[in-house]
Regions:
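Peptidyl-prolyl cis-trans isomerase
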Residues: 253
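Active-site metal-coordination segments of metallo-dependent hydrolases
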Residues: 129-130, 194-205, 279
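Substrate-binding/active-site groove segments that recognize
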Residues: 172-193, 204-216, 267
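Cell-wall glycan-active module
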Residues: 3-5, 10, 15-159, 167, ...
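Active-site microenvironments of hydrolase-like enzyme catalytic domains
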Residues: 238
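Cell-wall polysaccharide-cleaving catalytic domain and substrate-binding groove, primarily
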Residues: 160-176, 183, 249
Length: 316
């Protein structure tokens, strides 16, 4: 995974932006009591306000994250509409010609144009281990708050990157927040042949928080202001936009926004980013915030199914 490779040199420039007050996110937090103890996490109310939870992309990835890798979903590439579910062994048993015929049969059965791209996506519950990741959310939320950074980002990144596995990606990203080595160094972490602070949760959280505070949020604002788009930093669409910068890099996000030429900042901008590519902003970049939405939905369900008590951190 590539986090702002094009900004490693840029990161050496001082980009300190005034941090928000540490109590600014109290209204977004909840205390969840379970048999294992009490955890403070971010609530998911914003997902339901503008019906983000009903978007087919969010529903698709939610199902994929919970689905075993021995199964797959047949889906429309453009909007992730689910057409069918089947065993992956049955799909793989077909010849390429048979697979093409099967795709065409799905198009005809669902009234889709003949050139509609049909994807076959396998389940990924072997990677997304939410029960194992859950204990780290409280630590991530607390760490980001200490550094004056919206803890929603900590929760989202931890859910997506699944730190329970602690794998190094093919591009070199590592640690709970999947930081690239050059980016980690530019944010103050030691990464060399003998020491890699990315494997330490607290140091990795520090590096990710600094990256978001010093680069991602300022660059997101710059891109939006270039297009004269207004924003509120606690709006869900803005947070998702910042996540795109975190994952794909500001230059790539700027390129896709230039292509879209949006007239307002809203859910529609995020949905347009899911449908467009430019520079290095491709399929993986499009998927990143879809995964974030799906992961938050799964967390919401998991918390409400397993908790004994939920209380707001700020009285309303």
């Amino acid at each position: 995974m590539t986090h702002l490779l094009s900004f490693i040199a840029f990161c050496s420039i001082s980009l300190f932006v005034g941090a928000q007050p540490l109590d600014n996110w109290e209204a977004d937090k909840i205390k969840v009591t379970q048999a294992s103890g009490v955890q403070t996490i971010m609530h998911a109310e914003a997902l339901f306000e503008d019906r983000w939870d009903q978007l087919p992309q969010a529903q698709f990835w939610k199902k994929i994250m919970l689905l075993s890798p021995d199964s797959c979903l047949i889906n429309v590439a453009a909007n992730r509409q689910i057409l069918d579910q089947m065993a992956i062994r049955d799909w793989n048993a077909q010849t390429e010609a048979q697979k093409d015929s099967t795709r065409q049969a799905y198009r005809e059965a669902n009234g889709l144009p003949s050139d509609t791209r049909i994807y076959v996506t396998t389940g990924k519950n072997d990677f997304y281990r939410f029960t194992e990741v859950y204990p780290s959310l409280d630590k991530g939320v607390a760490a980001f708050e200490r550094y004056g950074v919206d803890p929603w980002y900590a929760q989202s990144i931890l859910l997506i990157e699944s730190p329970a596995l602690m794998r190094k990606s093919s591009t070199g990203a590592y640690g709970a927040f999947q930081l690239m080595p050059g980016v980690a160094r530019s944010m103050g972490l030691v990464v060399n042949s003998t020491t890699d602070e990315r494997k330490d949760f607290e140091r990795s959280a520090y590096g990710a928080a600094q990256l978001i505070r010093r680069v991602c949020i300022p660059e997101a604002k710059r891109i939006l202001e270039k297009h004269q788009l207004s924003y509120n930093e606690t709006d869900l669409w803005f947070r998702l936009f910042v996540l795109h910068v975190y994952h794909a890099g500001a230059l790539n996000v700027a390129a896709v926004v230039d292509k879209i030429q949006p007239t307002e900042g809203s859910q529609e901008l995020i949905k347009a980013m899911w449908q467009n590519s430019a520079a290095g902003f491709g399929n993986n970049s499009q998927n990143y915030t879809q995964l974030a939405l799906a992961a938050q939905l799964i967390l919401h369900d998991m918390v409400y199914q397993n908790c004994t008590e939920i209380s707001p951190c700020l009285s309303r």
